Amino acid sequence: MIRKLPCLLTGLIMTVFAQQPAPQPNGNFTGKITRLTETPPGTIAYIKFDAGSRTRWHIHEKGQLILVEEGVALEQRKGGPIVELHAGEAIWCPPGVAHWHGAAPDQGGTQYNVTRGGITWLDYVTDEEFHGKPVRK
């Protein structure tokens, strides 16, 4: 299956070749997520987050672009507010910044996560951190 991203990224239209959806082990996530696709050398991961699911705190060597396709997403940088994103919205996390992202506590959704370079995985996001009051982007 070929899935075209409905946006222009740094001057290029990217085409994603989808793999068979597969549930992921929970090593770097809390809750049920399904990675729908991934492409090297950079990564365009298409991920379905069930309600309440989220990543661990992590750092991207070269930053990360998060595009929300459907549902509601949350993103927080260390020391900053939780940002709420809706379908069609995007957020950029700069290189070297610790952050987490996932679904809202009561609503899941899908995201395109565009990254290059390494990822350093940190601590799990606590329930107290996750259930903070989000702000709209």
Feature map (PLM): residue ranges:
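Ligand-binding loop in jelly-roll beta-barrel domains
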Residues: 95-120
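Histidine-centered metal-chelating micro-motifs
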Residues: 54-55, 74, 91, 95-101
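Short acidic-glycine-tyrosine-enriched beta hairpin
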Residues: 79-95
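A short, N-terminal "cap"/entry segment at the start of jelly-roll beta-barrel domains
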Residues: 2-46, 56, 121-137
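Short, conserved beta-strand element in jelly-roll/cupin
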Residues: 60-75
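Short histidine-centered beta-strand/loop micro-motifs
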Residues: 36, 55-60, 77, 83-84, ...
